[in-house]
Amino acid sequence: MEVIRYPDSPFKLHQPFPPAGDQPTAIAGLLEGLSDGLAYQTLLGVTGSGKTYTMANVIAQSGRPAIIMAHNKTLAAQLYAEMREFFPENAVEYFVSYYDYYQPEAYVPSRDLFIEKDSAINEHIEQMRLSATKNLMTRDDVIIVATVSAIYGIGDPTEYQQMVLSVKEGDTIEQRDIIATLVSMQYERGDLDFKRGSFRVRGDVIDVYPAESSENALRISLFDDEIDRLDMFDPLSGSLHQRVGRYTVFPSSHYVTPRDTVLRACDSIKEELRERIDFFTKENRPVEQQRIEQRTRFDLEMLYEMGFCKGIENYSRHFSGKKEGEPPPTLMDYLPSNAIMFIDESHVTVTQIGGMYKGDASRKQNLVDYGFRLPSARDNRPLKFHEFEKVMPQTVFVSATPAKYEEEHAGQVVEQVVRPTGLVDPQIIIRPVATQVDDLMSEINDRIQKGERVLVTTLTKRMAEQLTDYYSELGIKVRYLHSDIDTVERVEIIRDLRLGLFDVLVGINLLREGLDIPEVSLVAILDADKEGFLRSHRSLIQTIGRAARNVNGVAILYADKITDSMKAAIDETERRREKQIKFNEEHGIVPQQIKKQVKDIIDGVYHEEDSGKGRRQGKNKVKVGEIHNEEDAIKEIAKLEKAMQQAARDLQFEEAAVLRDRIRNIKENLLFGAE
């Protein structure tokens, strides 16, 4: 592993191997585009060509902070894990929605039903979000991996920065002033329960557990009114890590605001409330008038007394001082002016960003019309697409199949078609629909004998279920992946396929972007000639690409006629194959099969040889006790089940799956007397 630092760059790139294939020309092309000031570029990178590694090299060589946007949490977590491997010494941050569960408040007029907001916040992800904004304000070497959560409103960065507590050894400050500042930053005093976002006081010592920190707490030791020393310590064991000369404590929430801003906002809210009461009075709607008055006055009372209230985000326009209709502050406002943005799988992500505002607006309008919220609540919203375009820094769209928007906005298109491994795009075979099920059966048996895996994509849920049942009855180990399966189970299923617990995975629209399964040598597309979203040329190219990570990769399209979409997908795949084969011949490259360990999404690596033993490699080790009898086994299972549920809550899905296997192994081998 080589560690590279480029001139004038704060990043240290841990390079497992030098760029190869099309990577060097892609990196050089993107860097040239950035220095030429191109607003938009497209990296057209085929599956398995190492697009993430190219991004890492561009970031390291440009020396500029970066944000990488993905269209779902699973893909974001995968990118985050890879970026942390490339930049372990830099600030790689994860910014996604911190809700494990979220039910927004809504009103259904037809049933006169008001649904209260209900949510469960994931502590670990909240800490990572706060860490992201802190590092954007204090460091140059920052890489943020985010989902569309980045375009939703958070606190104003200017006021957030005003609310910090900066302490330095030798400063003169009274203990009560430090405590008052911490309370105004929404830190809780917890002398008994010392947790993230709290502080405790013991004589002349104040311990602060910063909201954005997961491993370190700050000890402020005072001598009379002077700061005698500052130490970082382990909040769990209490052992000192290091002495620091100065430290900045950031607020425990993005919505913390100075007292004078709260008072100014309250006056503005009162003014809007008066206008709304007058409106409902004129309209002769006493129920709505009483409702808006009661709800808003309660919130105002909380704001006066506590500085915050439930649903404070609905008053964000009053706090930020923005005019009606102006965009709310978002993570984009925290980005430095020289940042770079990468939009991964842009053909999906760009469309997703564009659709966020409308769904939110229709729900809010009902709440405003029926007196549950003031009209200003409509401005607590995600960015509209044209607003997002205005705040986009220099952007690189990353996709194997760029859509219309990227084609219209590409200052230049940089191709990354040749893979570092020498692997070429899969060979495409077309066969008739009439015999597709039985023909596929014989193909599956061939692959099973070679120890390879198969992906099958169907058009309907019903067909996927019937196909799964049929193959299962014939003794094939097959699973079915559908939209009702949650993220945890989806990751488990893909991991189990890679480990060989089953051989065939059947799906509808879930076998496309971001699935990295080198063991898959055959992708079968049933009813490929049925035009539509699932069989568009982009969908076909993405699905065919799932077999591109295997040296024996083949895609079989079952069709009775060649549609325009099929022709476009086949032509593009053939164009890429020709270029890849020619490059290999010119450079004497023999395609190499990818051998990739099954990784944990957030931390560590799961080794195939540990399957069934459930050992963890990495930070989050679960210590396995010595098991001598049935009582020990039952205790161990209870402990592991608790750890498994916690891992799932923290979105560490693959860790949860490892623990599940460990539980299963104990049950089979110890409780039920298996050999």
UniProtKB/Swiss-Prot annotation:
Keywords: ATP-binding, Cytoplasm, DNA damage, DNA excision, DNA repair, Excision nuclease, Nucleotide-binding, SOS response. Gene3D superfamilies: 6.10.140.240, P-loop containing nucleotide triphosphate hydrolases, UVR domain. Its main location: cytoplasm. Residues 32-417 form the Helicase ATP-binding domain. GO terms for cellular component: cytoplasm; excinuclease repair complex. ATP binds at residues 45-52. InterPro entries: Helicase/UvrB_N, Helicase_ATP-bd, Helicase_C-like, P-loop_NTPase, UVR_dom, UVR_dom_sf, UvrB, UvrB_inter. Forms a heterotetramer with UvrA during the search for lesions. Interacts with UvrC in an incision complex. This is UvrABC system protein B. It comes from Neisseria meningitidis serogroup A / serotype 4A (strain DSM 15465 / Z2491).
